[in-house]
Each structure stands twice: as C-alpha cells, then as structure tokens.
Regions:
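Extracytoplasmic/secreted proteins, especially bacterial periplasmic and envelope-associated proteins
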Residues: 189-192, 196, 222, 258-265, ...
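Acidic/polar loop patches that form or flank catalytic/metal-binding clefts of enzymes
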Residues: 273-276, 288-289, 405-411, 491-501
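Serine-hydrolase-like catalytic core of hydrolytic proteins
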Residues: 91-275, 291, 305-340, 492
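Bacterial Sec-dependent N-terminal signal peptides
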Residues: 1-24
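Substrate-gating cap/lid region and adjacent catalytic-acid/histidine neighborhood
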Residues: 285-472
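Short, solvent-exposed turn/loop segments enriched in Gly/Ser/Thr/Pro and often Arg
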Residues: 161-164, 214-218, 411-419, 500-507
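Extracellular structured ligand-interaction cores
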Residues: 104-108, 123, 152-153, 322-323, ...
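Non-catalytic accessory segments of hydrolases
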Residues: 20-184, 208, 468-481, 489-499, ...
Length: 542
C-alpha cells in the first residue's frame, strides 16, 4: 500500500484529544493526482475519504463528453464531505442523501477502508446506486460502506451522471466524439471510476486485482453493462447484481441512430436543436426543460464504444467479463396491481392477460394460474415483477452460467420488511419511505419482498435505515445476507462458516439451485424457470 500518513507526531497529542471528543482525527494518503485528507474514525477503526474526485467536472464544454482525466493538485485536498450528487429531481421521494446539494460537477466517490499503516491486498467492493438512471447517489445511508469495511473490505461508492446529463445522445455529439458515438456518459463515468480504482486503491490498502462490482436496480443494470463492455475488461474480478439487467425489457441499450433521433427530437422540442445552444444553457434551464417534458430519462446506447452489441449477443459470444457472479431478485418486486390495474378478480385478470398476450394467453394463464382471488394476487404479482425486472435478471444469470465457465450463485430475497416505526410514513417506490397521503388508495399488504428492500440487509445497514421497526429476525436475515455478500467479495464464493450451504448453479440444470434468503435461509431447486423461458421467447432474447 502507498504510504497512508497519519499526521506528524508533533500534533498527535492535539489530535488524540480531539479524537476523544469527536471520535475522529485527520488522516492523509497520496493518490495518483496528489494528497487527500480524510478522517480516521477511532470508534470504528476505519479511514473515511468522502467526495474524492475521479474525473474532471463534466461542465461547460465537457457537458456530454466522456469523463476526462483529472489534473494533479498541489498541497492537500480535503475529502471529508460527500460530494454533490448528480442533478436530479425528486423522482423517488423516498431516497435520502447525505450529500450537499446538486451539481453537474458530481464525479466523486467515497472510500471506507480498515487499512492500517502498510496494509496491503484487501478485497474491494465498488457499489453503484440505483434509481432508474434518473436519480440516486453514493451518499445514501443504505449504501454506506462502513459495515463492509469492518469485514476487511475496502468499500467504494460512486457518483455518475443521470438523466439528460448522463444519457443524452445527439448527432452532433456523435460527430465530435473520437469514437463517433454519444450517450452512455453515466456508464462511462462508472468505467472511469473503475480505472481510478485500478490506479489508486492500493493507497487505501486495496488489491486492484480483487475488485468486485455491485449494485441494485439501475445499479445492477450498470453491473451488467460493465460486464458486457469491452472497456471494463480486466477491471473487475467479480460481480453482484440485485434486481436488474440491461436486457430487454429492462433499460436495454438501443441502436445509436434511434438514440440520436430521440435526442435530436427532444432538442427540437425545446427550441435548441444545435449542440451549441444546448451547451449554452445553464444547468437549471436545461434540467427544467427536460423535467417539463415528462421524460423518464434517455436510453442507453449501442454506441460501438461502450456497448458494441446487445448484452445477450455479447454474452453468447463469450465476450463479457468472465468472472464469478452472485445475482438474484426479490419475491415481490412490484405489486400485482401494476399489471391488473384493478381488482384481483378472475374477469379482470384474464382480461389483462389476453390484452398483454393475445396469442399466448392460455400458456400464460397456466404459468401464472388464477384458481382463486388469492392465487390471482400472487400470480399478478409474479407476472408484474417478472415483466418489470425479474425476467431480465434471470436472463443475465442464465447467460453467465452457460457462457462463462465461472461459478454463478442465484438468490431469491423473501424477507418482508416489518411495519414502519412511524405510522405517518408509507413505503416509497425506491425502497425508502415517504409521508403517507391519507387520501391515497390503500394498497394491499405485500405478498413478498418489495423492490430495493434488500439493500440495507445485504450491506449490513439496518441500523442506518431507522424508518422500520426492525426485529431480531430482521437482523438475523441481514447477518446472513451480509456475510454471503462479504464472503463473495473476498473469495468469489459466498459460502462460509455458520452459513447454509449455497451451491453454484450448474451450467445445464433445468432446475438450478436458488438460495432463498429469509429468517431460515436455504438452498432449493428452482421451480419457476418455465415462466422465464416463456418470457425469453416473448421478448425475443432466446
């Protein structure tokens, strides 16, 4: 490890006194571009570096360009506060950030490390946040890296550009880029962060050859993307995906010409068809016009640079990063009413199935049966969840186990969170909570674990998410899932002492092993893959 410098002995007495009061004192390390100063948390025994820049601010003429290398700095750069999050609206009101404000100048990362002087070779976890590529940031409490660091892991969270700033494509942008493509700037930011990790993580005690990337929802989609991209070859040693893959119908990349047309049409609609006009706008002007358009972001792009083809095509060709994969989804990603748009009655359910699958509705009704109102609720929940995100995640799992010769571990998170500690709150769309609207339609009780609800369990952060009345059972589930994840980051295998055995999925198994994560976690044979095989054909990914 490059020298991690605790401040000079002459001032140690001062800092020791301060540490007794504040539980921290300054600590420095030298990275590629200069010296940074974070804090040493004396209570937790961790070094914390927040708001570390990993690329030039993508502002001015760097708006809508691939991230550019940092210039070196002189002196000591303070890195004790989370950097600003990417520009975004309140898309998911339940997201809670600890960062200070919003800015196009958002390319910062955060590091938690247990390293002592001359520590070397620690495994590394790089976590990408979710939020549909339109919201989120690396400072959310549920992504906090302290628990992982206390397990002997260097934990990193990364900010990346979002919405119009991160994924806008346009013919003029493609023309000016050396690689003749545009869009995907948020994914390129992530890639730049991974390259930064390769250069600098040894300064924090980490081993650049032991980097596992992870994420949930759009963060999981990002993990798929990085595995598929030729730009990330050699940068990762393992991957964890929680509910999401960049495979149709879930935020899959589109052809460059289609993305350019989408961007050009948007630019015309706001009376700024040229790149010069778009770059001349202030951050606020541009974002307000984007927000007024009611667009939910912009698509990722097969730009010939980051993405060279679709994810299924890449994996089938064996061109992906062939690394161990731990991947899964939750038992009730979204409510069944997202599909039925009405009551769980036989008449309504069958009608909706026929509308969605006019040629194959009989097969769908066998796969998602409707023998009673309760069975309809369960089937509608399964179908809604599969169409939303479970199928695409399954497809990723299936591709990697068949075309990588690497171990692939599949899970199903089934723990339903306990009641909220505050009755004035209600669960939000992105895993957190929002104020309850007394006039809102009352949703049925959840029949399984909702989208994003596993994050604080797997990261060991229940104690930081205090909206719920966590029980001993919740902490038991968290300990199990957290240890599986930590073991995987360390070794590429989730198994360890005092944990139920988790077999890797066999390449050709029709009923591959699945770890059901709940109060009593256990591995079982998959019983629902016929659903995914049907959807594979329906979406044309087979």
């Amino acid at each position: 490890m490059k020298k991690i410098k605790l401040l000079l002995a002459a001032v140690c007495t001062f800092f020791a006194a301060a540490a007794q009061t504040n539980n921290s004192f300054p600590v420095q390390t030298k990275i590629d571009n200069g010296i940074i100063e974070g804090n040493y948390d004396t209570k937790e025994g961790l070094q914390l570096y927040f708001g570390v820049p990993f690329a030039k601010p993508p502002v001015g003429n760097l708006r809508w360009k691939a991230p550019q290398p940092l210039d070196n700095w002189k002196g000591v750069l303070p890195t004790k506060k989370f950097g600003p999050r990417a520009v975004q609206g309140i898309v998911f009101g339940d997201m809670k950030s600890r960062s200070e404000g919003l800015s196009e100048d958002c390319l910062y990362l955060n590091v938690w490390t247990p390293a002592k002087h001359d520590t070397k070779g620690l495994p590394v976890l790089v976590y990408f946040y979710g939020g549909g590529f339109v919201a989120g940031d690396g400072a959310e409490p549920r992504y906090d890296g302290a628990a992982m660091a206390k397990k002997g892991i260097v934990a990193v969270t990364v900010n990346y550009r979002l919405n119009i700033f991160g994924f806008f494509a346009h013919p003029e942008l493609s023309k000016e880029a050396a690689y003749k493509g545009s869009g995907n700037y948020g994914l390129l930011d992530q890639n730049a962060a991974l390259k930064w990790v390769q250069k600098n993580i040894a300064a924090f005690g980490g081993d650049p050859s032991k980097v596992t990337i992870a994420g949930e929802s759009a963060g999981s989609i990002s993990v798929t993307a990085q595995m598929a991209s030729p730009l990330s070859k050699g940068l990762i040693a393992g991957a964890i995906g929680e509910s999401g893959a960049s495979i149709n119908p879930t935020l899959a990349p589109v052809p460059l010409a289609e993305a350019e047309k989408t961007g050009f049409d948007f630019a015309k609609s706001i009376n700024a068809p040229t790149l010069a006009q778009l770059r001349a706008m202030t951050t606020q002007e541009l974002y307000e016009l984007y927000n007024a358009s009611k667009r939910f972001g912009f698509p990722t792009v097969i730009d010939g640079y980051f993405y060279t083809k679709t994810v299924p095509e890449t994996f089938k060709a064996g061109e992906q990063s062939k690394v161990p994969l731990l991947v899964g989804w939750n038992s009730a990603e979204i409510p069944g009413m997202a599909f039925t748009q009405g009551p769980f009655t036989d008449e309504n359910y069958v009608k909706k199935v026929k509308e969605a699958y006019p040629k194959d509705f009989e097969e769908v009704l066998k796969l998602y049966p409707h023998g009673s109102d309760k069975e309809i609720e369960l089937s509608a929940t399964a179908l809604a969840s599969d169409r939303f995100i479970a199928y695409s995640t399954w497809k990723w799992f299936d591709l990697q186990r068949k075309y990588s010769n690497q171990p692939v571990y599949r899970y199903m998170f089934s723990r339903v969170r306990p009641p909220l500690a505050d009755n004035s709150l209600t669960p939000g769309l992105a895993g957190g909570t929002v104020k309850k609207d007394p006039n809102a339609f009352k949703m049925p009780e959840p029949v399984g674990a909702a989208h994003a609800s596993e994050i604080e369990y797997c990261m060991g952060n229940l104690y930081l998410v205090n909206d719920y009345a966590w029980t001993d059972d919740d902490y038991k589930v968290s300990e199990t899932m957290f240890n599986y994840f930590a073991n995987f980051v360390k070794t590429g295998n989730p198994n360890g002492k005092d944990l139920p055995n988790w077999p890797a999925a066999l390449k050709d198994a029709t009923d591959p092993d699945v770890m059901i994560i709940n109060v009593e976690s256990k591995a079982v044979k998959a019983t629902d893959d016929a659903r995914y095989i049907f959807l594979d054909k329906a979406y044309g990914n087979n």
